[in-house]
Amino acid sequence: MNQNQDKGQGLLGRKVGMMRIFTDDGDSIPVTVLDVSNNRVTQIKTPDVDGYSAVQVAFGSRRASRVNKASAGHHAKAGVEAGTVLKEFRVAATAASELKVGDVIAASLFEVGQKVDVQGVTIGKGYAGTIKRHHFASGRATHGNSRSHNVPGSIGMAQDPGRVFPGKRMTGHLGDVARTMQNLEIARIDADRQLLLVKGAVPGAKNGQVIVSPAVKVKAKKGA
């Protein structure tokens, strides 16, 4: 996707955990609870000054002793509390003009039934073998197999090309990478507590930071 394309205003949040809710028909739906409270605008970027339109948002809170002077000055200029996360969302110029520095964007930015993309950092698993990391099959348990039960097998060829090709699936670090779940449906919104209940799972551990934005690959309903 073109990085200059307007993706719409989103929210920063925290993954509270998972639970389930019931529909009016009695169906059980697994949902992830996201805390999106106190999203405050720290800067409005305009085409005249910055070359593009965007809204910069801060989330969370951080002790003053843990904020460097540059960040403290930036938040003080906006008149808001320094946060743990700072991110900007590309929006249309008309949408950016509707906000001003210091505004708080509420969960009502979204609506029930809307499709969103949620980005988070997956849980780190440490150093992992090829079976866990790439779902390789293990070798024979017995019948002639000696100490080669979980080996990945050959990783190269012969004298030509005489090297291991880049991208070869091998052992290594698993997890702790940014991943985005696309087209998740908002099942419920708690306006009082500023919570979004999103259908399905979201990357990351409890209390992990997430980015919620309007879906960019919305699928059309069949027959529509």
Curated annotation (Swiss-Prot):
Gene3D superfamilies: 3.30.160.810, Translation factors. Methylated by PrmB. It comes from the Bacteria. One of its GO terms (cellular component) is cytosolic large ribosomal subunit. Keywords: Methylation, Ribonucleoprotein, Ribosomal protein, RNA-binding, rRNA-binding. The keyword Transferase does not apply. GO terms for molecular function: rRNA binding; structural constituent of ribosome. InterPro entries: Ribosomal_uL3, Ribosomal_uL3_bac/org-type, Ribosomal_uL3_CS, Transl_B-barrel_sf. The modification N5-methylglutamine is found at residue 159. Pfam families: Ribosomal_L3. SUPFAM superfamilies: Translation proteins. GO terms for biological process: translation. The keyword rRNA-binding applies. One of the primary rRNA binding proteins, it binds directly near the 3'-end of the 23S rRNA, where it nucleates assembly of the 50S subunit. Part of the 50S ribosomal subunit. Forms a cluster with proteins L14 and L19. Belongs to the universal ribosomal protein uL3 family. HAMAP family: Ribosomal_uL3_B. This is Large ribosomal subunit protein uL3.
